[in-house]
């Protein structure tokens, strides 16, 4: 029973799917995809549940969401293990993901009141009231890198706003999706308010093509995001929130403390085995002896990183990638860049064939032509050297993406220049690119997406503003507009 539709657990009628741990190959989940008819059934259930859910007092919706938060806290260890075993990330990092899920709920509730909710302005002859209304039935597409935390950033604000949902987790993380939905069930969500459909491309296409959807909230790759954008083009009545990837630059301009700069770079490029959309993909290092020393130290320390199993003791900094195929894709990208003329500074290495354990790779591409402007979702860092800061900004902006950008420098003026000229939604100074706060907007421009799917700013796209001019009485104005004559004529 792997689908949850209209409050019932049912068996999918689509393709059989099996999920294994990406490092041990242990089978950890089995089930069937939802077919097109079941996807449509989930949408019908969400549509039927919408009027009653939307009319619930906000306090009632909030109470269920807060019960979910309490269940997350009570089952934190269990969910941590599920996420770690399914994604391959270390236990310590999976635990931080569950903590982020819990913390985001209180922020989402506060954001609803601050950014949406209801506001009234008194007028001479009545009032002007701003209210927010839910869109209706929304589809939520989840990614695999943070299979609990990132969908949660759509689901919680959308439910608080009064929407009903169909959630499709990544086909690479079905177990996490199912585990989280079971907690929502225990929290007391009414039937049909949140529905779970498992599956891959066919299930996703069936979901995104439903005429009765009022919108789609997506976190994932740029290629899939572009497909969804094309599919929903010409349908302005549907809200489409896209959070996609990045080909993110980190500029190393002025290094006062080389080890601190190396630590920041490791956190930016290789945490989560390079599987964060904000990870640094392009390292821009100033030419000269200081830059040379920084790169030598980076290669030295990065070369000591040994990925390990989720439950290793002591815990590793990074675990496996989401699949052995993902690790192979990173290896192929590295070889492609070598073939273009890149100079390998640190060769990535498969720790064990057939697993997703992969050591970091670093390759210099200064002066190399035709380097693909793509997001390689893994621990591969591309290096360019530059002569002056204006050139660094030009290199940083030489991408169709625009998610995150960072600067290591002691010069505040350079950061202020970067703030003005960088084409990115996140611009950091002496901070890792991969840090994020739920109280701040998260997202970018260009191929990185449109809206800002964090707990605070997600409220903006989960409801639409409605303005009302209101008066309890209807009276004739004392002063009429020119040309209007309401004088009463005497009867003949």
Swiss-Prot record:
Annotated residues for binding of NAD(+): 220-225
Entry EC no(s): 1.2.1.71
SUPFAM superfamilies, alphabetized: ALDH-like
Key word Oxidoreductase present: yes
GO biological process terms on file: arginine catabolic process to glutamate; arginine catabolic process to succinate
Domain of life, source organism: Bacteria
GO molecular function per UniProt: succinylglutamate-semialdehyde dehydrogenase activity
Pathway this chain belongs to: Amino-acid degradation; L-arginine degradation via AST pathway; L-glutamate and succinate from L-arginine: step 4/5
Keywords: Arginine metabolism, NAD, Oxidoreductase
InterPro entries: Ald_DH/histidinol_DH, Ald_DH_C, Ald_DH_CS_CYS, Ald_DH_CS_GLU, Ald_DH_N, Aldehyde_DH_dom, SuccinylGlu_semiald_DH_AstD
Active site: 243, 277
Top enzyme category: oxidoreductase
Catalytic activity: N-succinyl-L-glutamate 5-semialdehyde + NAD(+) + H2O = N-succinyl-L-glutamate + NADH + 2 H(+)
Sequence similarity: Belongs to the aldehyde dehydrogenase family. AstD subfamily.
PANTHER family associated with the record: ALDEHYDE DEHYDROGENASE-RELATED
Function description: Catalyzes the NAD-dependent reduction of succinylglutamate semialdehyde into succinylglutamate.
Family matches, as NCBIfam families: arg_catab_astD, PRK09457.1
The protein, known as: N-succinylglutamate 5-semialdehyde dehydrogenase
Naturally occurring in which organism (per UniProt): Salmonella dublin (strain CT_02021853)
Lineage start: Bacteria, Pseudomonadati, Pseudomonadota, Gammaproteobacteria, Enterobacterales
């Amino acid at each position: 029973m792997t689908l949850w539709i209209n409050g019932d657990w049912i068996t999918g009628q689509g393709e059989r799917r099996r999920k294994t741990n990406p490092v041990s190959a242990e089978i950890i989940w089995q089930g069937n995809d939802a077919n097109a008819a079941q996807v449509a059934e989930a949408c019908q259930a969400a549509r039927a549940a919408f009027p009653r859910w939307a009319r619930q007092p906000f306090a009632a919706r909030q109470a269920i969401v807060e019960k979910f938060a309490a269940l997350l806290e009570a089952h934190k260890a269990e969910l941590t293990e599920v996420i770690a075993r399914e994604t391959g990330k270390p236990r310590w990092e999976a635990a931080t993901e569950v903590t982020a899920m819990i913390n985001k709920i209180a922020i989402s509730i506060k954001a609803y009141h601050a950014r949406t909710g209801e506001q009234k302005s008194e007028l001479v002859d009545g009032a002007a009231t701003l209210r927010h209304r839910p869109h209706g039935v929304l589809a939520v597409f989840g990614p695999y890198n943070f299979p609990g935390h990132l969908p949660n950033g759509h689901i919680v604000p959308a439910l608080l706003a009064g929407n009903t949902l169909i959630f499709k987790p990544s086909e690479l993380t079905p177990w996490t999706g199912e585990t989280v939905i079971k907690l929502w069930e225990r929290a007391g969500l009414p039937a049909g308010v949140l529905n779970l459909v498992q599956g891959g491309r066919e299930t996703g296409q069936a979901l995104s093509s439903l005429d009765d959807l009022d919108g789609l909230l997506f976190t994932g790759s740029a290629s899939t995001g572009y497909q969804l954008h094309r599919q929903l083009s010409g349908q302005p009545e549907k809200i489409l929130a896209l959070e996609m990837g990045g080909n993110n630059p980190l500029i190393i301009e002025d290094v006062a403390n080389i080890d601190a700069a190396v630590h920041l770079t490791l956190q930016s490029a290789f945490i989560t085995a390079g599987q964060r959309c904000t990870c640094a993909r392009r390292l821009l290092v100033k030419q000269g002896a200081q830059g040379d020393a920084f790169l030598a130290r980076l290669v030295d320390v990065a070369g000591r990183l040994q990925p390990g199993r989720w439950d290793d003791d002591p815990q590793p900094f990074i675990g496996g990638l989401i699949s052995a195929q993902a690790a192979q894709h990173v290896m192929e990208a590295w070889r492609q860049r070598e073939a273009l003329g890149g100079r390998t500074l640190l060769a990535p290495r498969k720790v064990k064939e057939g697993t997703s354990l992969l050591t970091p790779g670093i390759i210099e591409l200064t002066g190399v032509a035709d380097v693909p402007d793509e997001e390689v979702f893994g621990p591969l860092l591309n290096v360019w050297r530059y002569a002056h800061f204006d050139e660094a900004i030009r290199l940083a902006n030489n991408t169709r993406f625009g998610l995150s950008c960072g600067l290591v420098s002691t010069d505040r003026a350079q950061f202020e220049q970067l703030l003005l000229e960088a084409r990115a939604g996140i611009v950091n100074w002496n901070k890792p690119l991969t840090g994020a706060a739920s109280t701040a907007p998260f997202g970018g421009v260009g191929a990185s997406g449109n809206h800002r799917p964090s707990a605070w700013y997600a409220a903006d796209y989960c409801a639409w503003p409605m303005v009302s001019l209101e008066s309890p009485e209807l009276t004739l104005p004392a002063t009429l507009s020119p040309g209007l004559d309401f004088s009463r004529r005497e009867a003949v």
